[in-house]
Amino acid sequence: MSSIRATIRMYQKLFALRTYRRRLIVTLLAFFGATVTVAQLALWIAGQTASTTLAFSLVILTPIGVVFALRASLPKADISFRHDSATAPLRVLIGDLFATDDAVIVITMNRHFDTAHPWVSGDSLVTQLIHRHYVDHPDELRSAILKELSLQQEAEQPVGEIVRISAGKNSYLFLAVADRHEQTRSSVAVDAVWSSLSRLWQYARLNNISRLRVPVIGSGFARAQVGRVPLIILLLTSYLTAAMEMPVCGLEIVLHPDDADLDLLELVKAYCDILGYRAIDQKPLGEGYLALHPR
């Protein structure tokens, strides 16, 4: 029963998207068009009249067509890519950034590495991490970061500064990207995103990291000067550029369902094709992708 309820919730969310409704209608029309054509051809070969038999066939096939269209119209939620000219394995998926084990996860922060109000939003990735691993001692993460920085008190760090902390079964790279901003907690510029990404790839090489799991760098900060799609393109371009200069680790880009249209992966796939990537594995959206921890 729980699986059925999860599936119903998933389709309720999907039907709220105009892109999914349009895709579903196109798939249904294609299915019934092909069905009618094949049925008419079969009846013509058999020498039978089409009206009654054809109508009966359509009645029988309608439930099959609806089920087929509902499944076939599901957007892709997990795509793995391979590049023929660079060692740069890539995976882009819709899911929960924290839902993994033995991974190196990147979390972007402001240049003071703040972990609490007023400089950190209540639904930020940093706050989510604290709720998962430091809920009884919320100041412990802040103390661990300052210790790694060899600081007794806060001080602004350069863009791209990285602090590595282990928590639970994963390691976390806290990446300094944004500046403090009085009205919106943190703000970020495109050049800061590019610089921090360059530092991230260098860090991965120097520390022999095999794979990084990242959100869309820069998208979680207020007053970002561009939208989510350009930031994804920036992330992909930076990663492949670095890999062409020198081999770099594998990359997993995790998109939260609440952050983007579910057709976003189709756009990402198209841009990856332009960059020379080939999709080697694709998985459709399932109820597990939408039953995530709230942000």
Model segments located where?
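Macrodomain-like recognition of ADP-ribose-binding/processing modules
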Residues: 2-295
